[in-house]
Amino acid sequence: MTDENYPEHHLDYRPPLSAIDLGKVVYNGTYAEIYNYARDEYMRSIGYPYSKFLNEDKKNFAVIEMNVKFRKPLHYDEETVIVSKVEKIGTKSIVFDQKIYKENMQVLCNEAKFVMVCIGLSFKSEKIPEVLKNAFKNGPVK
């Protein structure tokens, strides 16, 4: 895997009512969905939407490891920012580092690390396309 300094992606996010549990905070199981949404937006921002990866490249990223740390609760409609960053890209795998902040990026609420493997239609690991690796290196399309 290569360690490089990949650009961060920032996404403004307000938890919807559907994400809230009986304790009036974001349900713990929902964080995986929130982070998945942020990764989709990250890929869209670099000019390589996940839909292209799925439909044209016929590839997918399968989560093989997920580590989540819960620090502060998130509430319905609260203004937050999700920061997503590629930590490492290998031949067939990628590591995403993601964090959720509130109060103008002053309070870290949640952080997660996802290790994902590129797979094809046969569900066997495949190489990550070089064009996608380069898109992550180059960052958001202006």
For the regions a language model picked out, list residue spans one by one:
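Catalytic strand-loop segment that frames the active site of acyl-thioester-processing enzymes
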Residues: 1-45
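HotDog/MaoC-like acyl-thioester-processing domains
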Residues: 2-3, 11, 70, 74-76, ...
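Residue-level signal for pocket-adjacent positions within structured domains
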Residues: 15-17, 48, 56, 123
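Residues that recognize and position ribonucleotide moieties
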Residues: 24-25, 61, 107, 126
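Residue-level recognition of specific faces of alpha-helices
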Residues: 33-34, 62, 115
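Hydrophobic beta-strand-centered segment that forms part of the acyl-chain substrate-binding groove
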Residues: 43-89, 93-94, 110-111
